[in-house]
């Protein structure tokens, strides 16, 4: 695999590969979730709607993220080619959401039962780390054990009540991962936009050559 080019950083004073200066677009690489999962997220949000109106919680975006990073606009074409080459040898796989979880800083989420396939998938993206840093961008943030966050924030006055309510709840859904979606937003924007979709090979299919 050829090493991607280093882009000229002269127009961005203060950029440094060693410090990972935070500028450029914010990118996310997310799993395309099936409709039944998105509906289940909406149903969970509906249960929490009264609390949200009271500003006691902040709902999460319904995404399953495996990578985050920053890159400049002029890097995007090379970035897309690079991701296409990485995923060109990756097969899709099945995984299961398995009940609710909670931990400090992550009030409520759906757990993934076996994250090993995600570890292998995210490891394949580590090759991008040097390219991003070499272009003066922040490093790559990979999520080898991703979670589907349901709440970003919960007020301390109701945190115990919310967690107890969902501790008795169950959720189980098997999902086939066949597509990843690259989203981006400018640093001054709140909403992400879809940049590109990447299809994975059929489950169990192995491509014999990376370069054609």
Predicted features and spans:
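Short, basic/glycine-rich phosphate-binding loops at helix/coil junctions
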Residues: 101-108
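Short beta-strand segments and strand-loop junctions that repeat across beta-rich extracellular domains
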Residues: 178-187
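A short, structured active-site edge motif that brings together acidic residues
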Residues: 94-101
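Basic, often amphipathic N-terminal segments
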Residues: 1-94, 115-176, 191-212
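Short hydrophobic/aromatic beta-strand or adjacent loop that forms the aromatic wall/cage
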Residues: 28, 107, 179
